[in-house]
From Swiss-Prot:
It comes from Mus musculus. GO terms for biological process: adenylate cyclase-inhibiting G protein-coupled receptor signaling pathway; adult locomotory behavior; cellular response to growth factor stimulus; cellular response to hypoxia; cellular response to toxic substance; eating behavior; negative regulation of gene expression; negative regulation of protein-containing complex assembly. This is Delta-type opioid receptor. Ubiquitinated. A basal ubiquitination seems not to be related to degradation. Ubiquitination is increased upon formation of OPRM1:OPRD1 oligomers leading to proteasomal degradation; the ubiquitination is diminished by RTP4. A lipid is attached at C333 (S-palmitoyl cysteine). PROSITE patterns: G_PROTEIN_RECEP_F1_1, G_PROTEIN_RECEP_F1_2. The chain crosses the membrane at residues 48-75, 86-110, 123-144, 164-186, 207-238, 262-284, 300-321.
Amino acid sequence: MELVPSARAELQSSPLVNLSDAFPSAFPSAGANASGSPGARSASSLALAIAITALYSAVCAVGLLGNVLVMFGIVRYTKLKTATNIYIFNLALADALATSTLPFQSAKYLMETWPFGELLCKAVLSIDYYNMFTSIFTLTMMSVDRYIAVCHPVKALDFRTPAKAKLINICIWVLASGVGVPIMVMAVTQPRDGAVVCMLQFPSPSWYWDTVTKICVFLFAFVVPILIITVCYGLMLLRLRSVRLLSGSKEKDRSLRRITRMVLVVVGAFVVCWAPIHIFVIVWTLVDINRRDPLVVAALHLCIALGYANSSLNPVLYAFLDENFKRCFRQLCRTPCGRQEPGSLRRPRQATTRERVTACTPSDGPGGGAAA
């Protein structure tokens, strides 16, 4: 199997989207066989493409449907009145965008070429980076939000408001645009070995900027946010162990601890799913390893697929960890357009005359971001 040039080739591509172009020294060019002649394909390459397509199809179906249900449920039932719900909506939006690109990537694997043109190439590559940064930034802010709710309940009344949460979400997308827009500009389609590839074209020297990009992504989309999250949960753990009642109400405390656990599990799932590919990319870039080893190549594909799988995992976690989300999902599936059935899925709760509160909300408390 003829291998394409080294990782410092003049044209580099995204490490997380167009996988066969991400690390050119490891993957065969489209249509290359063992003798180097175009037009043939090995059985192992075809089997890998079929396996990836099947996996991506499942991730796309579960992730797109699940995240759309999350967004619709939040808008329909909570009117975005709580800080936690607003952050969850932002996370679901980023995940839905990421899973929407998987059909294009599956087609690229099966066809061994990029048939969708440069405009979609730019969209797919930039969405990948937008998802990466908006997801971890949102999870970081959710952890900070939990820290303030647990450790500074008085300050939470002022900080954890819907308006401020929406403003923070806007800032998250603006910060992510600092990476997403340059990626969109650098994304190009280029002919290679009789096929078309969608890749990133870095300025000269391309190998230098490619390495700098990978290191910056590793630091700012993984290491630094994880450190902030770790500090927040470390301080929360100390607080939860030292104080029996955080809010003066046992019911409110149970809600507070339940939401904190849910956010921690979602953050943990993100770390488990994304740590392998981040570490793999850094090792691949900085360490001299055998990039032609089939096991290394297979491990890389597995790590990338695991990162994408995280986008379909969050709605499942919400359904299992939060009873209100579970009831909300059931109602959305049973009732056309999410209309509330009289008496269904409701428990006795206090509600103001200005806002009708239903049970189909994350357990964040009614009507305000500081409730829990």
